[in-house]
A protein has these predicted regions:
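N-terminal secretory signal peptides that target proteins for export/translocation
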Residues: 1-41
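Bacterial N-terminal signal peptides
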Residues: 45-57
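Short, charged, low-hydrophobicity "junction" segments
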Residues: 58, 170-178, 297-304
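Acidic, Gly/Ser/Thr-rich repeat motifs that build Ca2+-stabilized beta-propeller blades
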Residues: 62-209, 255-258, 263-271, 321-363
Length: 372
C-alpha cells in the first residue's frame, strides 16, 4: 500500500491523505517524479489521474507528508499528456519525447522529433494528444508539440502536428510559427490545450514586453487554430490583429485549461516581481501587460499605469508574492468529489500544488495540497 499525506495550507480545506489499496509502484514512481520536480506541464492532471488509477481514497489525516520515491528521474521534464489510461507522453526540454508505461515504469524514446533550440528556457516544451474516441489503437492519435525553433541566432515558438505509429511520429509538419523571432531565449509560453474543434496555444512576449501590445505580432498572446492548423474565420477581427490571435497582453502564460462547465479557456501567467495572474480568456480581449500589472519591476518600482486601465480585462485571481505558476487543470470526476469544479495549479517557485477554490465560477481562495 502506498500512502501519501497531503497537508494543505491552513484553511477550511483541512488536511487530506491519499491512500491507495492497489500495488502500482511503477506508476507511483512517475507520480512522485512529477510532484518532486514540479515540471511545467500537466502536473495536476498526472497527479489526479495517476492517483485515481491507483485506487485512491480521501480520508482525514494530520500526519506530515510521507512520499516514497521509486525509480530514476527525468531531466528537465516540461510537458505531458495521456495517450490512453496506461501510457503518458512526457517531454524533456533538451529535445526528448518519451512514452511512459505507468503500470511497468518502462519508457520508450519516440523518434522523428523536430530539432529544437534548447537553451535557457527554450527547447521541447509542451505535448498535447488528440485521441480518436472511436478507436483503441494508439496510432489513431494526433500529437501536437510546442517548442522553440532555431532560426540562425534567433528562436521562435513553433507547433508541429503529427501522427503516431507506436514508436515514431509520422507525417509531422509545422502548423504554426510565431512571427516574433528574437535572440532572447525566455518567455516562450508554449502551453497547448484542445477543445472539440480548436487548438489553443499560449505565447510569451519573449522578454520584449512592449511586443505584447503590438497587434501585428504573436508575442504575448493566446492563438487559436483549428485542429488541422488552419485559422478559424471567427477569430477576433480587432484592428490590425494577426489572424491567429485570440487574446493579447500576456507576459509569459504557462497554464491553459478548458473549464468543463462552460467550455471557456482559462489561463495563468507569470508576473514579474509579484502579480502572477489567472485570467478567463475572452475573444479579442487585452489583458494588459505591460500597460498594467499587479507586480513590480525586479529592481523595484511600478510597471505601467497601475493595476487597471480602460480597455484592459482584469484578472480573476492574483498571487503576490509570485508563486511562478506552471500547469493548470480543472478537476472533474467521482474519485475526489470535494475537488469537483475547482482548479489545480502548480508552483515552480515553491514546489507546490495549489487548489484554487471556485464559487459561482470565480476563484475565492487557495490552499496548498502538495508542498516540497
Amino acid at each position: 500500500m502506498v500512502t501519501i499525506n497531503l497537508s494543505p495550507h491552513k484553511s477550511k480545506a483541512g488536511h487530506i491523505m491519499f491512500r491507495s489499496h492497489m500495488n502500482k509502484p511503477a506508476m507511483f514512481k512517475y507520480v512522485w517524479q512529477v510532484v518532486r520536480r514540479h515540471f511545467a506541464g500537466r502536473l495536476m492532471r498526472l497527479c489526479i489521474i495517476a492517483l485515481t488509477m491507483l485506487g485512491v481514497q480521501i480520508i482525514p489525516a494530520a500526519a506530515a507528508p510521507l512520499i516514497q520515491k521509486i525509480g530514476a528521474s527525468l531531466s528537465h521534464p516540461w510537458g505531458m499528456d495521456f495517450l490512453d489510461e496506461r501510457h503518458l507522453f512526457v517531454t524533456e526540454r533538451s529535445g526528448n519525447l518519451y512514452l511512459v508505461d505507468l503500470f511497468t515504469g518502462s519508457r520508450n524514446s519516440i523518434g522523428n522529433l523536430p530539432a529544437v533550440g534548447a537553451a535557457q528556457q527554450g527547447g521541447l516544451l509542451d505535448v498535447a494528444v488528440l485521441a480518436n474516441q472511436n478507436s483503441q489503437e494508439k496510432d489513431d492519435a494526433v500529437i501536437y508539440l510546442c517548442y522553440s525553433l532555431k532560426i540562425g541566432k534567433q528562436t521562435v515558438t513553433a507547433i508541429d502536428r503529427a501522427g503516431f505509429d507506436g514508436a515514431n511520429l509520422t507525417n509531422r509538419r509545422t502548423i504554426f510559427q510565431a512571427n516574433n523571432p528574437t535572440a532572447r531565449a525566455i518567455h516562450y509560453g508554449c502551453r497547448l490545450v484542445l477543445d472539440q474543434s480548436h487548438l489553443y496555444a499560449s505565447l510569451g512576449e519573449r522578454g520584449n514586453r512592449h511586443d505584447a501590445q503590438d497587434p501585428t505580432l504573436h508575442a504575448g498572446a493566446i492563438v487559436r487554430l483549428f485542429h488541422d492548423g488552419s485559422i478559424p474565420a471567427d477569430n477576433p477581427k480587432q484592428a490590425g490583429w494577426a489572424p491567429e490571435l485570440f487574446s493579447k497582453g500576456h507576459r509569459n502564460p504557462q497554464g491553459l485549461a478548458v473549464n468543463p462547465e462552460t467550455g471557456v479557456i482559462w489561463a495563468h501567467e507569470h508576473g514579474p516581481r509579484g502579480g502572477d495572474e489567472i485570467n478567463i480568456i475572452q475573444a479579442g480581449q487585452n489583458y494588459g501587460w505591460p500597460k498594467v500589472s499587479h507586480g513590480e519591476e525586479y529592481s523595484g518600482g511600478s510597471i505601467g499605469s497601475g493595476t487597471k486601465a480602460p480597455g484592459i480585462t482584469d484578472p480573476v485571481w492574483v498571487w503576490t508574492p509570485s508563486i511562478a505558476p506552471s500547469g493548470m487543470a480543472f478537476y472533474r470526476g467521482a474519485m475526489f468529489p470535494n475537488l469537483n469544479g475547482h482548479l489545480l495549479v502548480g508552483s515552480l517557485k515553491f514546489k507546490r500544488l495549489y487548489l484554487v477554490v471556485l464559487e459561482k465560477g470565480l476563484p475565492v481562495r487557495d490552499a496548498i495540497m502538495l508542498d516540497g
